[in-house]
Amino acid sequence: RRSFIKGAAAAGAASIFCHSPDRAHGYQSPNDRPVFATIGLRNQGWAITSKSFKFADFAALADVDSNVLGANVEKTEKTQKKKPDSYKDYRKVLDRKDIDAVMIATPDHWHTKIAVEAMLAGKDVYCEKPLTLTIAEGKLIERIVKQTGRVFQVGTMQRSESGKRFLQAI
């Protein structure tokens, strides 16, 4: 069951590049794979990152905990055979022009701030739930998505998967 949930999260993250035909078909060559970064690497952050290596290259990882960051940099390097850059300050990730998208799995109260800054920096975003803590934050996200035209995906597994709905029905 855990594997399924992690796989569903990775599929959700992958779907941020299937929003429009040019993106869905734009990454055909191994030389033209999307470049990702993950911000927040504990538990769910690493789970979605580790399931995403098959469709993206990770150029950077960010986490405020040096121990968590170091361990995940090592695991990423072993998996993709290239060491990602590491940052304690997520803003350094957003400053990079080579990163196409970020996956955000920080504590909940950081989600909106980082997601907005990422879109304004020209990044597509996959963000774990809950996306926002207030209605005003939700409206801000909506406005920034429309303003920037960025692709935005929220991880909603366990809330929308068919197995969950089936269990609720019985």
Residue ranges of predicted features:
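N-terminal secretory signal peptides and thylakoid transit peptides that target proteins
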Residues: 1-11
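A structured beta-alpha segment of the ubiquitous adenosine-cofactor-binding alpha/beta core
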Residues: 83-104
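Oxidoreductase and adenylate-handling cofactor-binding alpha/beta cores
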Residues: 161-170
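NAD(P)-binding Rossmann-fold cofactor-contacting core
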Residues: 58-75
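Beta-strand-loop-alpha-helix segment that lines the small-molecule cofactor/substrate pocket
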Residues: 107-108, 112-160
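Short, conserved SAM-binding/catalytic segment
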Residues: 74-80, 144
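C-terminal segment of N-terminal export signals and the immediately downstream linker at the start
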Residues: 16-50, 54
